[in-house]
Amino acid sequence: MTEEVGQKLLESLSLFKLGDIGYARIECELLTTFLEEQLENNLDSLSIHELSTNLIRNRICCREFIESRPAKKWVFLIFRLARTLFRDKTRIATFHSVNLHSEFVQVFWRNLTYQTKSYRNCKFQTFQFIASRFLRSEHDWNVTVVNCLNVTQKLIDNGENARKFVDCNLEDAVLVLLATRQMTVLQHSLEILGRLSDWSTTCRENLCESNTIDVCLQLIPDGDILTQKLCISLLRILSCEEQAREQIRIYDGVPTLLGLLSIKNSRLQWHVAWTLAQLAEQHETSLEIAQLGGISLIFAAISNPKPPGKAVGDWVAMLTGLTALLAQLAQASSNQQLMSNANGVYILGKLLAIKKNVTTDETIDSWDLLQCSIFRVLRLMYTFERSRQLLKKVLPTEIFEKFVDVGNYNSVLTDYDQIAKMYDNLIEENIEIMKDWETVNERRQAVGEVGEYELLDQLGAGAFGCVYTVRKKAQSHSENPAKLLALKEIFMTNLNDRESDKSFGDMISEVKIIKQQLRHPNIVRYRRIFVENHRLYIVMDLIQGCSLRDLIITMKEKKGNFEEKKIWAMVVQMMLALRYLHKEKQIVHRDLKPNNIMMTTDERVVITDFGLAKQKGPEYLKSAAGTIIYSCPEIVQNLPYGEKADIWSFGCCIYEMCQLQPVFHSTNMLTLAMQIVEAKYDPLNEMWSDDLRFLITSCLAPDPSARPDILKVSGMCGVRLLEYLDDVARQQASTSDMTASQSSYNIKIDESPSSLNSSTSSYKRPGRSSKTSGSGKLPPINPAPRRNHSMSAGETPRPSSIVCLPRITDKYSVMFPSAPSAIPSRRRVQTCSTEHPARSSSSTELKVSKQSDGLTVSSNVLRQIQDPVLTILNQIHRILVVTDKETISTSMNHQRRLVEMFRKNLLGRENDAVQMKTHLRKLAAESPEEIQMNLGFSDFRPVLVQSHINGYQKDQKVTKITYEQLSACIECLIAENPAAK
């Protein structure tokens, strides 16, 4: 019986009888019996091979079979048999040996794109039975399509076979299925696209030109774990292409990806990490990831990691991916600082011995790769001065030498292999070496107390004292963490009690001047001064940033140069600080150098270390102070000097920013002094502007009388100063507008639900229009304001005219039967004639004429009343027309995506009816107000360019879009789509 069924099925598949219903019914019965009883196990290999060949040639790759429009059950059984047979790789090889890939795609996939565009008008309907019918009736055809996709997925088993399918444009057809709501179909489609793009550059390029990235980013927030993994995996593969990375950035994909880092799933986190690592190759995206808190999220994921019970290999790969992302972020010096502030050195160091905490039977070859990746991040962080000090404390000498020899900004992972093996051997010999990392833990308990402050970490030390990071002792009633401050400790030794007290008094008086007077954003703020245990303590703001010296060293190690715009931004801020010190406070800093100029994380310049500052008196200062290579000729020659000493140091700092080396440098002190006195230095490179050259030359004038003061310096930089202030004003205006818009958006609108006219007039169009409601624009609701002229003797009144109101019909009584008294009597109202004396000088008298049949008025003086409900419905109709699913296009269209995101937000759960009405009325009025929604764009410039809209800065990001611009996009989409018209 078994052999008989198999033989009959083999014979049935060897031929095809067009239009024979009985033949189709018999084959369906044979297929059902064969599958349910699993008869393929009873056939010999030759019969199975023949069965597979007939199935391929005469069914799934046969155009005549498909054009006969077989029944759904028949197609389902055919693909179920194919799915069963293709579990064996030899039968998959049989399919590829037949070489009918093109026929398979054409028969089952090619016409899918035509069917989804307009399957009713398509003459060639070979896929209507499986594709177009599925899109129209997903539930009925779901299982059939899943089997078809599963078979296709099995056939894409290597790169060569994947490229054969790509040559037949299989990805274009599968892409359309991403519009389905059936999760199984969606996941199989994503898997197929991932396999094709992973093995084919052509496929990646084709998908980048489609809306694939947009679809994936929209599926991620609401999808399950498997869907999220498939979407992120596809994005990771496509991110090899620059076009894909640009699309992800434009579609605001970076925040979406960062939000997935906190999900405890190793494979998902691995995909996210490598996707972000590729995006972070662009400097701006790297900074954006850091600004969005990405560095903190990464360290939270790798600090105190707990190995899973199974799939440890995936877990190790995830840690490697996250450290690779950190390595890419560490290419930016500002990110190095954030990583150091996040206790990154300690967290990464403890991760080096994670292998000792894992017990597993799995053979994991990626431990060495993880250690190499960790050392690469630490080496990139080493270029930051703070991290350099910490790493010197913990790395053994023999390893530290190899560590330094790798070189700065070396991202080649294999160069760290020897270091990783050496350190791993040290751990094997003595696990106690890992305790050394506790000394660089900046989150440990306070190391001591001084007064009301807890000492957290030592920032630096010198001959006269130390500088600590401190915080106020926690208050029992306070839940907020204490603000971090800097505490400067000054030793007072070798003094008797009387001298010590006097010195304390003198020093406190000197610093009190600074504390009480200096209030400037570019100058460090001193908070408190106190004495304890024969030591002077100065509390000041902790500058979260790095010094100009660190920036110069980092840039020199990168073998690059600062952008001139950035140099001017720092120069202007330093000028503002010096003007404040010299002209308002009469203070000379006397030790202005790159080490004392800090750059915060938001690129604000802060001048610090006023230990040598002096307040100017009537006489010139005479004491020697400062670092000699930044000292002016007057100080070197021990001559009186004034505020222009700071101008000289200012010029030295600017020169060093440009050339990345001090303006005067020599190992011989006498030679160095001669260079300073004679102002002999190497000229600037030709790459710098004439303005910068002239500024440095003027500041480094050896004759103090020829050297300008800070006001003249500002005059030399007038144009640059105005450009900087213009940028600051623009940023403040943008921030202010955004805050104001957000505040107004959050205010609850108090209005009656039944009143549609009450708030219509509160949104005015920029201009008048004579278009009717069909245009989607609102006319002004309130009539023109009327003026009541007084009838005083001093005015010549104008002759009045009779005002006739339209007759009020009985419709009023029908609409409001409960209020008959509100119906006015029909009469003619006439204004008082001005030919008679007025009874009042401040009012207009109305005179009632005899009762007549009704009131009449000319129709041409009436203003047409427009139903606001129709206006709102018109906007809804326009939005639905351009986002109609029957007009699905797989091509990338920024405008359509914008409208779809607006519709999604408008109809979301967070919007109530009042907010929906407000948004639609603003859209109808083409309001210039910005839309306060997350529309999924980090930059709207591609949308505006595609819509040919002007009026924005083309060289700056456009992070918000107005209702007026959205309306223009909708009009463009309607104009481009004949069906929408």
From Swiss-Prot:
Family matches, as Gene3D superfamilies: Leucine-rich Repeat Variant, Phosphorylase Kinase, domain 1, Transferase(Phosphotransferase) domain 1
One short Pfam name that applies is Pkinase
Output compositional bias ranges, type Polar residues. Answer: 735-746, 830-847
Q: Name one GO biological process term.
A: regulation of cell cycle G2/M phase transition
- Provide any one GO MF term from the record: protein serine/threonine kinase activity
Among SUPFAM superfamilies, the record links this protein to: ARM repeat (SSF48371), Protein kinase-like (PK-like) (SSF56112)
Q: Which cofactor does it need?
A: Mg(2+)
Residues of the active site are D591
The annotated region (Disordered) lies at: 735-802, 823-847
Q: Keywords of this protein's UniProt record, alphabetized?
A: ATP-binding, Kinase, Magnesium, Metal-binding, Nucleotide-binding, Serine/threonine-protein kinase, Transferase
Cite the Protein kinase domain residue spans from the record.
453-725
Which reaction is the catalytic activity of this chain? L-seryl-[protein] + ATP = O-phospho-L-seryl-[protein] + ADP + H(+); L-threonyl-[protein] + ATP = O-phospho-L-threonyl-[protein] + ADP + H(+)
SMART domains from the entry? ARM (SM00185), S_TKc (SM00220)
Q: Does the keyword Transferase apply?
A: yes
Residues where ATP binds: L459, G460, A461, G462, A463, F464, G465, C466, V467, K488
Where is composition skewed (Low complexity) in this entry? Answer: 752-762
From what superkingdom does this record's organism come? Eukaryota
This enzyme's EC code(s):
2.7.11.1
Into which family does the record put it? Belongs to the protein kinase superfamily. NEK Ser/Thr protein kinase family. NIMA subfamily.
Name of protein: Serine/threonine-protein kinase D1044.8
The organism is: Caenorhabditis elegans
> Which gene underlies this protein?
nekl-4
